[in-house]
Amino acid sequence: MNPFRCDGPTLVNFSGGRTSGYMLRRILDAHDGTLPADTHIVFTNTGVERRETLEFIAECADQWGADIVWLQRDGKSPAGRRFHRVSYDTAARCGEPFAELITERKFLPNAVMRFCTQALKIETARDFMRSQGYEHWTSVLGLRRDESRRVSNVRARAHDEWDVSCPLHDAGVTAAHVAEFWRVQPFDLRLKSYEGNCTMCFQKGRAKRERIAREHPEFVAWWAEQEQRVGGRFCAHESGYAAMLEHVRRLPLLPMDLDPQGDDGCTGGFCTDRRRSRRPLWCMCKRRPGQPHALACVLARDEMQHVGTTEGV
C-alpha cells in the first residue's frame, strides 16, 4: 500500500519547510494531483514565521495547484473554534497570535512547557477539523526515516480524535532524498538549513540563535519584548534575548557559531530534544551557570587567566 495515499478524513500538516513540502508533493502525486474532498492541507501561522516560509508555502500552492488552508489561532473565539482562516496577504507577520497567547497565559512557553506549539499549531488545526464535522481523522506529519526517535515519540501519544501517520518514515525517506528533490526543482525555500521557519525559536541551540541574531538582529526585538513585558525568560538558564543580542554585538564571530551540529528547533509542530553543550575536559575557565562555554573562554583569555582555543567546543 502506498503510504502517501489518504484514506478517510485526513489532516496534512504543512509546516512550510522543505521536508513537509516534499511530503506534500508525494501525497499529491499519489492522488494524481487531485486530493480527496476530505483531505485538508493545513498551515498554521504563529505570526513569527519567516517571510521566506510564507513565500514558499504560497509558491507550493501556485506551482502545484495545491489548496492550502492558512489558519491562525483566535483566542477571542469560543473554545473549540479558536481559529480563523487567513491567506498569504492577510497572515500575521508581527507575532500577533503568539503575543495574544502569551497575554492569555501570563507567562512564557519554555523547554518544559511548550504551549506555543500545542495552542498555536496542534489545537488550531484540531479546531479546524472539528469545524468540518469530523469526529476522527488521520494527522499526517512530515517526519523522515532518519527521525525515527521522533516518530516513536509522536506515535506513542494517544489521541482520541486522530491517528498519526508518518508516510516519509514509512517510505524510507531521509534528509538526503529531500535535498536531492529540491536540488532539481524550479523553486525552493530560500532559507539556510540552520535558520528554520520560526524566527528565533527558543528550541534552537544557543549557537544557532546567536548566528541568526548576528545576521538578522531585527528578529530579536519581538522575543525580547515578550520577555520584558511578562518578566520572564523563554530559556530559564539564559539571561534573555536582549542580553544575547548585546553579547553578539560585543564579541567576534567564534568557531562554535559555525558548527552545523546542534538543535533544529521546532519543525512541523514537534520540537526536537535539547542537547547538552560539550565542554573540553582540559578547559579550566570558570564558567558561570548559563554562560556559553566559548564566552567564558574569551572572557578568561581577555583577562589573561586562560589561554586556549575554542576548537572542538
Regions found by a protein language model. Give the residues of each.
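Nucleotide-activated chemistry modules centered on ATP-dependent adenylation/adenylyltransferase
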Residues: 1-313
